[in-house]
From Swiss-Prot:
Protein name: Transcriptional regulator FleQ
GO biological process: DNA-templated transcription; negative regulation of extracellular matrix assembly; positive regulation of cell-substrate adhesion; positive regulation of cilium-dependent cell motility; positive regulation of DNA-templated transcription; regulation of bacterial-type flagellum-dependent cell motility; regulation of DNA-templated transcription
Record gene name: fleQ
Effect of R185E: More than 75% repressed pel transcription
Outcome of gene disruption: Deletion results in the concomitant loss of motility, mucin adhesion, and the ability to synthesize flagellin.
Amino acid sequence: MWRETKLLLIDDNLDRSRDLAVILNFLGEDQLTCNSEDWREVAAGLSNSREALCVLLGSVESKGGAVELLKQLASWDEYLPILLIGEPAPADWPEELRRRVLASLEMPPSYNKLLDSLHRAQVYREMYDQARERGRSREPNLFRSLVGTSRAIQQVRQMMQQVADTDASVLILGESGTGKEVVARNLHYHSKRREGPFVPVNCGAIPAELLESELFGHEKGAFTGAITSRAGRFELANGGTLFLDEIGDMPLPMQVKLLRVLQERTFERVGSNKTQNVDVRIIAATHKNLEKMIEDGTFREDLYYRLNVFPIEMAPLRERVEDIALLLNELISRMEHEKRGSIRFNSAAIMSLCRHDWPGNVRELANLVERLAIMHPYGVIGVGELPKKFRHVDDEDEQLASSLREELEERAAINAGLPGMDAPAMLPAEGLDLKDYLANLEQGLIQQALDDAGGVVARAAERLRIRRTTLVEKMRKYGMSRRDDDLSDD
């Protein structure tokens, strides 16, 4: 193993505990066996918590059950991975505990699954220990293209910070349009492979009969139509990152070949006997339930465990509605930067969008913004300008819009420490241009005030508690537009 470690086997079923200890001894794994009552005394025999590779957890009959024991283990070492013996983690367990459960093992465990699970625990442990040894703490806004202050997006950022510059395989889970490729590109950009290529491939968009050639390349004459030799995606990604999007759509025969490459880091082009070595990091993504596919026999379990070393789950947009206003600002800013027009949304329209279900997630929101920018160039969008399916409040319902806005602002402030809260601003590790930062902050607040005031400068100045003439000067400074009826007052 990568260093001297022991497995901590905690099980109140003595017969099962004894049987599993025999299996682990046969595999050459050192373990400490105990029950749920005396685990602290046994763990005290270790020099420190990092000497424990993982915990194999079986029946827990002590007070509070498995959840209480897992909380105790987390207080001892929050980075300690868990392998469950028997049933998988119940759905009602807290998310922070479920995230540390890497696998569940049936008794007697299969040889391959036990080895794969221990391998995942080893990679998981090594990854966290490397980050801890470096003492690296990236600032929360490092991954800037992940827009939002919700708890869900903060958790994604935190997990990305932990795994970015390791070589661990990452499996990104989430509905279509939630930004899985954005996460993959961020992981590559902030890894030690950032100078290497990032090569995406959509496994569901390539016909099954062409997928092998697409991934591994082919030699001239390997099949009808192969008039020249061609490098595959693995070759193109050598030294960098290969992003396998929609991995759940990969046919079973291709899954076997992919598993071999992941295990041996070698492959052959179609029509060639020459074995090539490859050094790539694998990031996979899917919107499908791979565990259900394993049960149905449409996805290989061993491949799943190879890919699922570090899972990251993207929340759907309907579960982080407090991010919608920020996403709108970001999407509009990108349009303006690309000189594709601009629009603004009033408060009622934003509140109406917050009540939409968003089956297409962020992609659906981006398409809506682009559509409205074409239909109402440089206009202020109210509820009446939204397509019918997005109208969930009335423009006149200002009281509802105000209360909803306050609720969203409160949620965002609690999650992210926005101005007005006690949480301090975070200085990026690379530093920043304070003058530019403050100018951007001021411009953003002015724009928010103008949006809330429907573009009326006088009302916006009242919200900002400054003189109207001062606001006009600042708007001229930043090149911001204002309503025609205000221009006549100057």
